[in-house]
């Protein structure tokens, strides 16, 4: 298969789940996984792609779970936001160790730890070839980091939101429970809603749909998958307004 020499996307928003960082550990951050992800992002930067990153916090804390146990949801979500900052600090450090310039911006002020989020500063940094990591979600409780990824993607005028998962894309059913589940190559936004496919929460998904922000779901654990997606090769599932 011939590889397109030019990337298909100039500016991307990469959404990493917190769970992706824990590797096989089951909790926390696996340094090996972190370094591998930093190297994959470095490859994109070397191709001239502008990279924004949103990381979840589920490897360190889950606010929704404690809310069910009686904790105030707002408090739980604030704790979850801080977990994403911890992951962001780890990712920034991994990128710096890989000799990649990176900035960490938080939606909630954390002076001395990271920069405050600024839309104009983020775009300027991206244009200068720096990776920008967006932490603390949207800065508001009740919104997921998937919502933050779509919001930041729209704000920075990214070409696509790349959602890194543990499976090869969007399936017609749970591929673990159903071996006959079909992997979709392309889907329209309405197909996802009609088929009730689990891509991301409804608030995040409808935000992307309303602003015609394409979403590509792919397997981050597959070596080279991120590069193949960015080069426009057949990898994962593309969700857009094209039928």
Curated annotation (Swiss-Prot):
Record: residues binding ATP: 15-18, 58, 62, 165, 171, 174
Origin superkingdom: Bacteria
Annotated region (Involved in allosteric activation by GTP), positions in chain: 23-28
Subcellular location: Cytoplasm
EC code: 2.7.4.22
Pfam families in UniProt: AA_kinase (PF00696)
Membrane-spanning segments: none
Annotated GO biological process: 'de novo' CTP biosynthetic process; UDP biosynthetic process
One GO CC term, this protein: cytosol
Pathway: Pyrimidine metabolism; CTP biosynthesis via de novo pathway; UDP from UMP (UMPK route): step 1/1
Entry keywords, A to Z: Allosteric enzyme, ATP-binding, Cytoplasm, Kinase, Nucleotide-binding, Pyrimidine biosynthesis, Transferase
First-level EC class: transferase
Chain positions recorded as UMP binding sites: 57, 77, 138-145
Keyword ATP-binding recorded: yes
Gene3D superfamilies assigned to the protein according to its UniProt record, in alphabetical order: Acetylglutamate kinase-like
Molecular functions per Gene Ontology: ATP binding; UMP kinase activity
Activity regulation (UniProt): Allosterically activated by GTP. Inhibited by UTP.
Catalyzed reaction equations: UMP + ATP = UDP + ADP
Subunit relationships: Homohexamer.
Family statement drawn from the similarity comment of this UniProt entry: Belongs to the UMP kinase family.
Function: Catalyzes the reversible phosphorylation of UMP to UDP.
PANTHER family per record: URIDYLATE KINASE (PTHR42833), URIDYLATE KINASE PUMPKIN, CHLOROPLASTIC (PTHR42833:SF4)
HAMAP family membership: PyrH_B
Protein name: Uridylate kinase
């Amino acid at each position: 298969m011939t590889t397109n020499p030019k990337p298909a996307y100039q500016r991307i928003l990469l959404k990493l789940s917190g769970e992706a960082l824990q590797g096989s550990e089951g909790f926390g951050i696996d340094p090996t996984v972190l370094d591998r992800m930093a190297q994959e992002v470095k490859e994109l930067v070397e191709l001239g792609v502008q990279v924004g990153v949103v990381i979840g916090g589920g490897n360190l804390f889950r606010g929704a779970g404690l809310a069910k146990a009686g904790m105030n949801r707002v408090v739980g979500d604030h704790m979850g936001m801080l977990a994403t900052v911890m992951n962001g600090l780890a990712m920034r450090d991994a990128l710096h160790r890989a000799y990649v310039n990176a900035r960490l911006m938080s939606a909630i002020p954390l002076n001395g730890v990271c920069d405050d989020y600024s839309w104009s500063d983020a775009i300027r940094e991206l244009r200068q070839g720096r990776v920008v990591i967006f932490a603390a979600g949207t800065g508001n409780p009740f919104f997921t980091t998937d919502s933050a990824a779509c919001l930041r993607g729209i704000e920075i005028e990214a070409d696509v939101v790349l959602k890194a998962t543990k499976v090869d894309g969007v399936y017609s059913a749970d591929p673990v429970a159903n071996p006959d589940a079909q992997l979709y190559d392309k889907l329209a936004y309405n197909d996802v809603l009609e088929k009730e496919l689990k891509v991301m929460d409804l608030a995040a998904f409808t935000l992307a749909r309303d602003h015609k922000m394409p979403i590509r779901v792919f397997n981050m654990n597959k070596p080279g998958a991120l590069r193949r997606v960015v080069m426009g090769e057949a990898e994962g599932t593309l969700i857009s307004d094209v039928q």
